């Protein structure tokens, strides 16, 4: 299985500042030139919301303050500027190989 290691496990960021969450895969998640790494946001009592797919593409209705980057094994989610509504859990997710796997999550809070 592809193991996804997320860091940090928790993060506190001031409003208007930048939050950076990293995800490292145990092997490349690139398939035919496409990075099959995605990012989700989850709030208590709600299903996960797709933020970023294919490493850097924003999902439908996702604000421009969310961006993704990376390739191969190393990926990042950046939120800038941080807003109150962004306090949530964030997960990376790979779909290159079955079983699809998730990172352990990052608990992002307002500082």
From Swiss-Prot:
Region ranges (Complementarity-determining-1): 24-38
GO BP terms: adaptive immune response; immune response
Pfam families per UniProt: V-set
Region listing for Framework-1, in residue ranges: 1-23
Region (Complementarity-determining-2): 54-60
Residue segments, region Framework-4: 102-111
Stretches the record annotates as Complementarity-determining-3: 93-101
Region (Framework-2): 39-53
Cysteine disulfide partners in this protein: 23-92
Ranges where the record places region Framework-3: 61-92
Protein name as it appears in the record: Ig kappa chain V-III region PC 2413
GO CC terms of this entry: immunoglobulin complex
Keyword line: Adaptive immunity, Disulfide bond, Immunity, Immunoglobulin
SUPFAM superfamilies: Immunoglobulin (SSF48726)
InterPro entries, per the entry: Ig-like_dom (IPR007110), Ig-like_dom_sf (IPR036179), Ig-like_fold (IPR013783), Ig_sub (IPR003599), Ig_V-set (IPR013106), IgV_Light_Chain (IPR050150)
CDD domains: IgV_L_kappa
Gene3D superfamilies in the cross-refs: Immunoglobulins
